[in-house]
């Protein structure tokens, strides 16, 4: 039986809790996605802790909501964030996400703000040595997660964020870690839209775990500077979202597509309305 795009979207669409502002009641986020008939969710640690992990697990089970991603672990260059990995893996044992997102961390530490535990040689950017050191830590983390039956999704980070967020910046640089294990890549269009390997990887690779998507804002110097909602009316420099979603929709596996924007991307827009209109806005792209 051939499924329609609507039927596929009903199965595959997820939305990440990063969108939900901290000052909003986290329960309202769950209530809104249930009302919008979205069956999958991505979670981040601050949301989990505001909700309470046991209460959140009950709500997800009650409403039959699948967890596509738990965000994030790794951050191998900054001890403060790196030391939280065990806590987040313990959350994964309870919430059972399809993947726990792994982000390598900035050459200068991070994510922002830098912690007081972070130190570096400020006179030189020793990128090759930091990548070498992190490679060992990634392998150790993969082995630990495998022993816990937790699947990880390593995320390539756009090279323009190498100093503050991630120092493995391409699909090819991340794939080398995925041999002989069940871990995969999480592809975020915001970070990988210009990757040479993107199209073929999304179409065919068995190492794709999840596609995170949104539109992109560019600053006056044409650098990525934030995320945008899915527009019905095309604007200048929109990504060809339809193309990338079709790649996932045409796959024979159960790979999900996860909408991800952040509170600072809302620009005064009501997150509830964004959630309620998301399915329709995506489907209108295919008309």
Kindly give the residue locations of the regions a language model identified.
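Active-site-proximal loop/turn and secondary-structure-junction residues that shape catalytic pockets
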Residues: 19-21, 45-49, 73-76, 104-108, ...
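Short acidic/polar active-site loop segments enriched in Thr and Asp
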Residues: 39, 98, 209, 254-255
């Amino acid at each position: 039986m051939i499924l329609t795009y609507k039927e596929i979207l009903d199965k595959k669409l997820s939305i990440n809790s990063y969108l939900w502002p901290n000052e909003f009641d986290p329960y309202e986020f769950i209530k809104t996605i249930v009302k919008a008939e979205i069956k999958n969710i991505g979670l981040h640690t601050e949301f989990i802790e505001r909700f309470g992990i046991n209460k959140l697990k009950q709500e997800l089970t009650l409403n039959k909501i699948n967890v596509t991603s738990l965000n994030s672990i790794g951050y191998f260059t900054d001890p403060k964030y790196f030391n939280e990995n065990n806590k987040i893996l313990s959350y994964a044992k309870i919430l059972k996400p399809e993947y726990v997102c792994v982000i390598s961390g900035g050459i200068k530490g991070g994510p922002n703000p830098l912690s007081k535990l972070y130190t570096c040689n400020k006179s030189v950017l020793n990128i090759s040595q930091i990548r070498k050191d992190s490679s060992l830590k990634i392998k150790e983390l993969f082995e630990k997660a495998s022993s816990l039956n937790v699947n990880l999704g390593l995320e390539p980070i756009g090279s323009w964020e190498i100093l503050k967020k991630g120092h493995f910046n391409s699909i090819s640089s991340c794939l080398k870690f995925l041999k002989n294990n069940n871990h995969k890549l999480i592809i975020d269009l915001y970070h990988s839209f210009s990757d040479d390997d993107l199209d073929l990887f999304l179409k065919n690779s068995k190492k794709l775990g999840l596609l995170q998507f949104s539109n992109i804002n560019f600053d006056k110097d044409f650098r990525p500077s934030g995320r945008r909602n899915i527009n019905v009316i095309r604007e200048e420099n929109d990504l060809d979202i339809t193309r990338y979603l079709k790649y996932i929709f045409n796959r024979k596996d159960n790979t999900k597509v996860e909408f991800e924007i952040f509170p600072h991307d809302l620009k005064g827009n009501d997150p509830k309305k964004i959630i309620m209109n998301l399915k329709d806005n995506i489907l209108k792209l295919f008309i």
